[in-house]
Amino acid sequence: MKKSIIIIFVIAQYFVGLKAKADEGMWLPLLVERLNYVDMQKMGCQLTAEEIYSINNTSLKDAIVVLNNGQCSGFMVSDQGLFFTNHHCARSYIQSHTTLEKDYLLNGFWAKEKYDELRNDKLTASFLIRMEDVTNKILPYVNESMTEEKRIAIIDSISIAIVKSATIGTSYTAKVLPFFQGNEYYLIVNEIFKDVRLVGTPPDAIGEFGTQSDNWKWPRHVSDFTLLRIYTGPDGKPADYS
């Protein structure tokens, strides 16, 4: 289970470009079966590619949260909207709630009830709904004889149309991004939730212990986590704070 969480935590950074080798760097979940799955099996992964990424069934991609359109990531741990992220990812929000009387950086914070949870105005949490290869909808309309300016204009125009078609009548947002040095294009559809509340966090001395001097070193003696909760409307769709 631990190995699966680590794999998916890396995959969650889907918006980052791929390295030259398929087994390095950040991986696109859509391409796991095509580029990474055989090697993942050799390393002990017992999940199927469909269990990692699926647009028709629940998969591990549905447990991954992306904060503020890519600032950080996290993972769901309950059907009540609870998820974990790193302490440093939420630190600025913890600080925004800190006062002389209630020093949450010094003492930490834990909500005893849901109504004690703290609102974070500018914090969003998004989920990947699906990815789609749209290369064949874009590249046939550009060629090497075009100026860079014209090529960009055509790609942007087609991308806008693709995004509009993918999101019309939904609460989703979307974008088209180039990969492999512009040789492939992918539509990424997300659902963004705007009501994300602080549930619990350890004191700064524990959550930030070692700071950057210990970063990427193992073992680490730090509780680098914060617990947050996503709130939705009655229909389960994104809703403003209420």
Where are these regions (language model features)?
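Bacterial Sec-dependent N-terminal signal peptides
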Residues: 1-23
